[in-house]
Amino acid sequence: VRTGRSRRGRNGGYQQQSSSPHANAPGQTPGGGAHPHPPHNNSHNNQHSQGPGPTRPPEPLLVPGFDPATAPLIKPWEELTSIDPQPRLTMEYPGCPDSCRLIDLFCPIGRGQRALIVSPPKAGKTTLLKDIARAITHNSPECMVIGLLIDERPEEVTDFRRTFASFGNDASGNPKAVVMASSNDHGVERHIAVSMQCIAICRRMVEAGRHVVVVMDSLTRLGRTFNLSRRYASSGRTLSGGLDAKALEVPRQIFGSARNTEEAGSLTIIASCLIDTGSIGDQVIFEEFKGSGNMELVLDRKIAERRLFPAINLSASGTRKEHLLIPEADLKTVTALRRRLMQMPPHVQIEQLLAALRRFPTNGHLVGSAQ
């Protein structure tokens, strides 16, 4: 593991320099201030940037709070032992949005979770991702939150940056959350470089014992990006929807990096995935990642059209091994509540839950009243 200070190159990108005991967070300048653009390299360095691909030689990376003197004691990423996601990352806090309380009840998220937010267009996924990021910075200050935006609209990138900046700084004066983004006015190589550098930085932070949460929007656009690359979509075989047979190999490795480790830290990835876009390729991308996640939260367009938010489809949403994240007594009550709700239409389920959230100030009161 090597770390380094960064300097601005003539092309506006960041180039890595020699080791330094004081490394900066992703998107920060050596002075400590957040830079408005994520770190990226020029086209030559893109060919050698560290990422999930097995053939890329390592480059010095910026790891917040890492002392290079401890590098010989750190266990490499490939040798870390993966374990089940836990403990739970609690979303509920005083005055939190309803979405946070419903996630805690029906789709709990733990450290190391590989979570999919499955959503049709205009169902509220972006708002949900920002609510989750705010809740994590509020309740879990030990976690570093990174927003990874690929091929997003420039105004969405600005909105994310301002929202994340409003979360404030931690006790050390570093931002609680940063954004690494490549908007849709940039090219494919820029998208790939940003996503691969982000996940490489996260891996080094986990090796150093940090807990990292990546909020990604979206896996669908990431898959599209790699499908447009001559380097990564090079098998010569085309699947349904125009996807190259090798196009999703690296995106699978990126999403699969999320894990809790026994010897070091954890990497949690909460990524949105688009469905019902009218594109066969987008559906293929969703099916490819569906089996890789261990938590799935599905948003319903019909519920959103009734202006009911969060528009969660409870019957299709859930977390694997949720018994590790929810106390046994609460789990029995939540299971009974879920069974009762399954007898109602999806929009009625949300109406009933929102009414219950208004009656009870906390989830503890709600679950206790149902026991």
Which residues does each PLM region occupy?
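Arginine-glycine-rich low-complexity intrinsically disordered regions
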Residues: 1-59
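N-terminal non-cleavable signal-anchor helices
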Residues: 2, 60-64, 158
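P-loop NTPase catalytic core
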Residues: 122-124, 130-371
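Extended, compositionally biased low-complexity polar/Lys-Gly-rich tracts
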Residues: 48-72, 77-80, 174-191
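P-loop NTP-binding catalytic core
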Residues: 56-117, 123
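Short intrinsically disordered coil segments
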Residues: 44, 75-77, 327-332
